Structure formats: C-alpha cells, structure tokens
Design a protein with these regions (language model features):
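Well-ordered beta-strand positions in beta-sheet-rich domains
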Residues: 24-26, 47, 114, 154
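Exported/periplasmic cell-wall-interacting domains
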Residues: 60-159
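Short, solvent-exposed loop/turn elements at domain surfaces
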Residues: 35-36, 58-61
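Short, surface-exposed secondary-structure junctions/capping segments
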Residues: 35-53
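Soluble periplasmic/extracytoplasmic beta-strand elements of cell-envelope proteins
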Residues: 4, 13, 49, 92-94, ...
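Extracytoplasmic
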Residues: 7-9, 22, 45, 88-90, ...
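A structural motif detector for short, solvent-exposed N-terminal "entry" segments of globular domains
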Residues: 1-33
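N-terminal post-signal-peptidase region of extra-cytosolic proteins
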Residues: 1, 26-40, 72-79
Length: 159
C-alpha cells in the first residue's frame, strides 16, 4: 500500500501494490497552502513515510496534545469552550520526510514540524484547506486508513 495526497483536489488516495486506487478520502490541508519551512504553517510536499502510528485502541474523538491522549473526548461543548484550539483527534499518522534538504533535516524537516494525518471534529469542512500544516481527515475515514497502513508506508504529497 501507498498513500498519495493531492492538494488541489483535497483528496487522499490509498493505492494498492499495482498503483490502483483502493480507497479515496476527502481531506483538509493547510490554509496557508504548501511549503516546507518550519513555522510556515504550510503542508509539506514530496516523498514521506509514516514514521509512527499513534492512538491504537483509543476511543473515537480522543483528544491528543503532543501525541498523547489528554483524557478528553471531543464534543461540541468542549469545542465551544476552546474555540481557538487546533483539535487533533482519534488517531495520528506522524509523517517523516524522505528528501534531505527538501522535507528532511534542518528547517524543512517534516517530522520535526510535527506534521500528521489526523482526525478532526465533524464540524471541520473537508475538501477545503484549513489546517495549520497537517492533513485533516474525518474520524471514521482515519480509523479505516489507520488499520490499512503500517509504519513505513510511503506517502507522496503533491500540488
């Protein structure tokens, strides 16, 4: 399996070993567009791998901060209480760049930028950029994807 993320269409394709689309999901990438620099709040481009899978066994809508469950379960009431919070929910696929000087090492290191594929509240619109760099997915879609991929799975992000 391999993941291909197309920024213009805001779609994530899970490809089988022949390169055929096995699953297609709507996503939300960065509101600032694409870019490699740390602090840009952009979605990085290029070849990546899934560095780590985080959150297996946690309930749907589990809230994560710094890749750790907080003990909170997201609800619309919690969202209203913290309207400016960037919600990372349910599962995390932590990405690592594979291209030194482009998306790996130094000020362009995807992993050190903490770029994830992660779940988000149901109120977040998919198909429209809006994150601060990560790839947001519907929780149910992410649960499915999480079970279909392994750490080390290739992820290509293109504009």
């Amino acid at each position: 399996m391999k993941i291909a993320i197309d920024i213009p269409s805001q779609e994530l394709d899970l490809l089988d070993d022949r390169g055929d689309i096995f699953r297609r999901y709507r996503i939300s990438s960065a509101g600032n567009g694409t870019g490699q620099q740390n602090g840009s709040f952009c979605t990085p481009l290029g070849r990546h791998i899934i560095r780590a899978k985080i959150g297996a066994g946690q309930p749907v809508n589990t809230v994560f901060v710094r890749r750790r469950p907080t003990g909170e379960i997201y609800s619309s009431e919690l969202g209203a209480a913290f309207p400016g919070r960037d919600w990372i929910l349910t599962r995390i696929l932590w990405l690592s760049g594979c291209e030194p000087g482009f998306n790996r090492l130094g000020a362009v290191d995807t992993m050190r930028r903490y770029i994830y594929i992660h779940g988000s509240p149901d109120s977040v619109e998919m198909g429209k950029p809006g994150s601060i760099g990560c790839i947001r997915m519907r929780n149910q879609d992410l649960l499915e994807l999480f079970e279909l991929v392994d750490a080390g799975t290739q992820v290509d992000i293109r504009a």
